[in-house]
């Protein structure tokens, strides 16, 4: 994380909100742990995380791994948000998928 923050600052960027990809919860846990452990002060400030998956449409996955695509899962999101120390600021979801509108209303 520090290498990313340093690189971005060297290009004039002072705040970052990096994106995850569509991974298993286990891998996302590791990403959230790294983000939570990061200390701002040198390089660009980590101001949030954009969770790009896994709550995306299986029909429009782009570069994401279809193996990990799933419906919006509020319990999983809460676990990841707790691990990140509240850093998840954006969550990409597929609005046409079952359960997504409830997820949006609740979060």
Kindly label every feature range from the protein language model.
Residues 2-28, 45-57, 84-96:
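Divalent metal-dependent hydrolysis catalytic cores, especially in the metallo-beta-lactamase
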Residues 1-6, 102-106:
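N-terminal glycine-/serine-/threonine-rich phosphate-binding loop
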Residues 8-11, 34, 38:
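N-terminal hydrophobic targeting/anchoring segments and the immediately downstream early-domain regions
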Residues 57-65:
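A short acidic, helix-capping loop that chelates divalent metal ions and anchors anionic groups
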Residues 37-38, 42-46:
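A glycine-rich helix N-cap at a beta->alpha junction
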Residues 24-25, 64-69, 97-98:
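Short, small-residue-enriched loops and turns at beta-alpha junctions
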Residues 31, 36, 70-107:
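Histidine/acidic residue-rich metal-binding segments in metalloenzymes
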């Amino acid at each position: 994380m520090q290498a990313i923050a340093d690189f971005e600052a060297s290009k004039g960027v002072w705040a970052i909100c990096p994106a995850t990809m569509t991974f298993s919860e286990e891998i996302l846990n590791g990403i959230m742990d790294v983000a939570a452990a990061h200390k701002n002060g040198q390089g660009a400030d980590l101001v949030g995380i954009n969770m790009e998956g896994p709550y995306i449409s299986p029909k429009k996955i782009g570069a994401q791994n279809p193996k990990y695509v799933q419906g919006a899962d509020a319990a999983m999101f809460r676990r990841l948000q707790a691990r990140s120390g509240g850093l998840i600021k954006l969550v990409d979801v597929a609005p046409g998928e079952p359960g997504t509108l409830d997820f949006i209303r609740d979060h």
